Amino acid sequence: DEAWAEAERSRIGEERFRREHECEFLIYDETLVNSVRLVELEGKDPIWVQGQVRWYSKPKPKHTYMVALDPSIGTGGDYAAIQIVELPTFKQVGEWHHNMTPANQQIRILQEITKHINDTIMEQDSTATPQIFYSMENNTLGEAALMRVMDIGEENICGMFLSEPIRKGHRRKFRRGFN
């Protein structure tokens, strides 16, 4: 009955109630976005596709863009992903993911994305100074991506490479990217 359901929701929470009593497949692990909200989100079709990159809006002058790579080995298992986010709105403007692209090519795709953002902004306003930042995970798989960035040269990728600051008291060698 409804009174029992309301009391049970209050006792165990909406997410657990929906998972246990309404048989919804909600993620149990902690996520950045609440799993109930994730289930309610609706997909949006891209406004255009450039290769395997899906664009949801056109980069604009006077906005800042963050391009983040989560690399993978590229052999058909785990997917590599690149998210393109407009700041300060945190609006997703584009994305790429693939599980057969090797790490060195993942960096080429990141490079093409940052160049596209830069060129698109400059086409709209030739006096603009595009604000583009990029980074990547630096775990074991990320090491190959970081080496590729070193091979290409950071100066050949539009934008500024962001990395974790060295934590006070840590003597560990500095590594580019984020853990």
Language-model region placement:
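Gly/Thr-rich phosphate-binding beta-strand-loop-beta motif of the actin/hexokinase/Hsp70
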Residues: P59-L87
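C-terminal nuclease/phosphodiesterase catalytic domains that cleave nucleic-acid phosphodiester bonds
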Residues: E15, E20, E24, Y28-L32, ...
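Mg2+-dependent endonuclease catalytic cores in nucleic-acid-processing enzymes, primarily RNase H-like
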Residues: E86-N179
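ATPase catalytic-site recognition across NTP-hydrolyzing enzymes
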Residues: D1-L69
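Functionally constrained cores in energy, signaling, and assembly domains
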Residues: H21-E22, D29-L32, R37-L38, E42-D45, ...
